């Protein structure tokens, strides 16, 4: 099966004053359509930076990233942003919800950015809230919800533009074990429906939900398993 995400000899180095800090080194990775991959490794190993490369949130210092066969190095910043908006949904450990918007408003936001009409986006947002079991919380602010509920809102928001890929960075890191398990069950369901899911985690129990595990250490892929 042809990969839908491919990293070819990807390296990333950050400059801090006069010091160069290599974070990723010669990463080669292929992720197939409908795969569910967990990226594991110790703190500071480069997991989150790798996810940023996969999600086109940052550009590599060397090598190339391809999404659906498109070489991102050949795209402008505007084209990359458009690709992200259409193809990729992000879920973060800290939820990143707008505190002054209710659940419905937070889920609608990506559709506003993509200039979808008001009636269409409200209907879609309510459907997505139903998908994550929070339709009755549509009018509630993030401050009125538990951590698990806020993460489910974040997942609904990530699905707003019907992305092919869901990328999640430590999505259960701030949750209790029950809420974390509920979140992973949503990812499993989304994967079974045909979406490609990539999760960064340090938790073996969370990674056990995935089809493949990629191990990273000191900026290099050091192993993986099914």
Regions inferred by a protein language model and the residue ranges of each:
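ABC family nucleotide-binding domain
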Residues: 2-216
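H-loop (His-switch) and adjacent beta-strand-loop-beta switch element
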Residues: 213-226
């Amino acid at each position: 099966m042809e990969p839908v995400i491919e990293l070819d000899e990807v390296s990333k180095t950050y400059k801090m004053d006069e010091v160069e800090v290599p974070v990723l080194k010669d990463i080669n990775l292929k992720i197939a359509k409908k795969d569910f991959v967990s990226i594991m490794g110790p703190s500071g190993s480069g997991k989150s930076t790798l996810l940023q490369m996969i999600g086109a949130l940052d550009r590599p210092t060397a090598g190339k990233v391809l999404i659906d066969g498109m070489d991102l190095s050949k795209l402008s910043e505007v084209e990359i942003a458009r690709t992200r908006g259409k193809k990729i949904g992000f879920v973060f450990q800290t939820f990143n919800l707008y505190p002054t918007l209710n659940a419905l408003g937070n889920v609608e936001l990506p559709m506003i950015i993509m200039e979808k009409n008001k009636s269409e986006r409200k209907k879609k947002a309510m459907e997505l809230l139903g998908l994550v079991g929070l339709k009755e919380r549509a009018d509630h602010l993030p401050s009125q919800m538990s951590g698990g509920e806020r993460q489910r809102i974040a997942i609904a928001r990530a699905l707003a533009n019907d992305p092919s890929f869901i990328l999640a960075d430590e999505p259960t890191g701030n949750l209790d074990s029950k809420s974390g398990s509920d979140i992973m069950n949503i990812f499993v369901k989304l994967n079974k429906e045909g979406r490609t899911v990539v999760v960064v985690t340090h938790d073996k129990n969370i990674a056990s939900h995935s089809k493949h595990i990629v191990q990273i250490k000191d900026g290099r892929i050091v192993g993986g398993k099914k």
